[in-house]
Amino acid sequence: MVGGYRIGMHFLASALRFLEPRVDDDFVDRLHYLYTSTLVLMFAVLVSAKQYVGHPIECFVPAQFTRAMEQYTENYCWVQNTYWIPFQDLIPHRLDDRERRQIGYYQWVPFVLAVAALMFHIPSSVWRMLSSQSGLNAALVLQLACQEQNVDPLVRNKTIDVLARHIDDALMYQREHGARKKNIYIFAVVRVGKFYGAYVSTVYVFIKTLHLCNVIIQFLLLNSFLETAEYPLFGAHVLYDLLLGREWRDSGKFPRVTLCDFEIRVLGNVHRHTVQCVLVVNMLTEKIFIFLWIWLSVLGLITALNLLFWLCALASAHCRQNFVAKHLDMESDQIGRFTDRFLRPDGVFLLQMIASHAGNLTCAKVTEALWLIFLRRSGKPVLDEKVESSDRGEWESNDDAARKESLPRRESWHEPPLPPPMPQLPIRSHYV
């Protein structure tokens, strides 16, 4: 008994772990897989409680019906669907005319909402599966960049050094082994010429596209599920009805009062009854679907703009170079080569994520550390670009700088100690 309880709690904890926010994404991604998914799942639980715990349908039956017959009528009408006829219209005599007016979606509302919540989470699961295939651990990099211990300057400097080394090793791994690891690019379609350094960034843009496609599919499913194909903009039409003063009696989208036909055998004879029923659950369902339609409209617009932003930021070489130059705060003819040959799109993507989560200061420090690695590997003097003077001027005054000049000089990550003289070896360029 105790073992089964532990197993159940383990599976529950594993399921809830998927609802935890990740660090290797942005706010728009969390709008999809965390906030929207959780909200739709709550709606599914709410409607389920109303249907299976409360009384979703109440029928007006003849006076001679007993309580058991009334319960049978309500259960039958709930399972076999009801149909809606405007009060000013006559009830059709033909049974097939009545069947064409049946409303059969309200029983499936909780299941449809649960599937919708799952669909909002699928792109995030695909991102988790594909983002770790390149050796560039974006989640680990952002966790280190965002840790609270970085408020200590010593810890921050050590963290920046670790981040720069990890990013450099991962980018070098991509340059050296990317051509031999072509199978990891099949799922994300990232064969962008000879630049295998665009794997993570291309997968991320692909996930953004999945989010946008999911919102569009949700619109199509909403109209198909509610059988409102003649109104492509379902929520807009319902709101238009409400603005004109047309309530549910006229529109028929979520009718509260419906009709139900059923037959009863009495002494070998079949008696047909037509009763009038109240679908209380439709009042709740109407509000949920109108809210979802409006929310999907806003979410689709936000996702489209966000996708356009990331496409420009990662696909445009000019945008990538401007981003790197802004955080280096310098002008150099080597920035283009540093961005396109050393960092490449994946490195710029990581720096943009660091700037978004840990702030521009941390991003500038990491960019500068990578710049120093690039200069050393290129065989250029490390201090010929005056990196330290432009950065220190933002956080310390001239008096502090003069006072520090009078103190014994300490090593820092800006000025690495010079190694003892060694024979000059040929320098191998990994990014040319």
Give the ranges of each region predicted by the language model.
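Membrane-embedded alpha-helical segments and the immediately adjacent membrane-proximal loops
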Residues: 1-400, 405-408, 414-431
